[in-house]
Amino acid sequence: MLDITVKHIDELERYIGAFRKGQRFFYAGKSLGLSKLGMNAIRMPKHWEHYPEHDHAADDEEELYIPLEGSGTLHAEGQTYPMHRGVLIRVGAATRRKIVPGPESMTLLMLSDRPDSK
């Protein structure tokens, strides 16, 4: 028997919690039944400034950011990195980062080595 799960991003379970209004955060990995990989998705409106600056030093979680739609900028410890479709960005656990969408809304897929990632 095939072990395949297919879902559109709009079918994923939504997270409703500490994030600020304007964004939509999805439990992608949980919705797809992933058990060995953390995966979430977020849709942010243009120029949205409320993505929290954070790191994952306490839980030693590295992240991979994959922009699906739109564009933005990753800010990390005084450096900036353009984010747009086709670009993959890995960020180590101890690096503080913040993401700001550009002049259009941005949909971002986030992968990690922790299945329980939020």
Located regions from the model:
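A short, N-terminal "cap"/entry segment at the start of jelly-roll beta-barrel domains
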Residues: 1-38, 45-46, 118
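Ligand-binding loop in jelly-roll beta-barrel domains
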Residues: 33, 93-117
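Glycine- and acidic-residue-biased ligand/ion/polar-headgroup-sensing regions
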Residues: 60-73, 77
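Short acidic-glycine-tyrosine-enriched beta hairpin
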Residues: 78-93
